[in-house]
Amino acid sequence: MTTKLNVLQVIPKLGYGGAETGCYDIAHFLSENDCGSFLATSGGELIKFIKKDKVRLIRLPVHSKNPILILFNTFILVIYIFLFKINIIHARSRAPAWSCYFASLITRRVFVTTFHGTYNFKSNIKKFYNSIMLRAKLTIAGSNFIFSHINENYWEYLSKEKKLRVIF
């Protein structure tokens, strides 16, 4: 017996940007291809267009960088992951990636990220904060430029066990 693929995507806001529309498109693609599609976000303009009979929407303050809210989001995500038998957790931004990372450790689910842009890293603390995007089993780089940026600036967070792929 095969297990149905259930994917949870987590993005701060579902607006009209590239990461957001990609998230929206993949959510509907998954549902149209017999996969469970779940989307956690704090809000955004595209929410009204989500086919709620096909994509389960989870409203959480995943846009917040507040450590207490990141921890809160972690525990709520853990509940959803177990309740809906989520197989893959896909984070598309740094703040929600921390919640997803901790939830993946607790639930032992596959953690994936998409690295969409270059991040400021003037301090070691900021670089550590950004490094969450490379702590996944698979990190997707949104372009060859981002792929090069990751290799040049975050090489110490890359390992042979974790994969880095480029899409464009």
Features from the language model and the residues they span:
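Membrane-interface segments of envelope glycosyltransferases acting on lipid-linked substrates or membrane lipids
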Residues: 1-168
